[in-house]
């Protein structure tokens, strides 16, 4: 990904979308959302997702790209957002990354490579089966053997 991008970051409902749109209009840019909840379709409440009017005022990317049941990760975000940014730059426009998910933003702008990152659910599946067979109390007692502080919080 080319390094020419603008980033607008901050908490939910702090005016990032409005500023991003103004920058896109003034600088010939397109918005790339960096919000871990706005990627999901039908997750509009509580996410301050850009409205139809705001989307009409500037091109938006990385909104409504996944179903809520879909597995999503920072690695996948970086892969798809990088592709968006590269495409925007190839068309002579400026990517404007707008959002509040710091991990997404940091990973995108630092160019982290997740190519060798694979998900292995073996341990998760094993522990889930253990929980199902032993029950919550026994599983908590086992956790206390390895991490008493964490077990005490549960």
Predicted segments, located by residue:
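Phosphate/pyrophosphate-binding catalytic cores of soluble transferases and nucleic-acid-acting enzymes
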Residues: 1-154
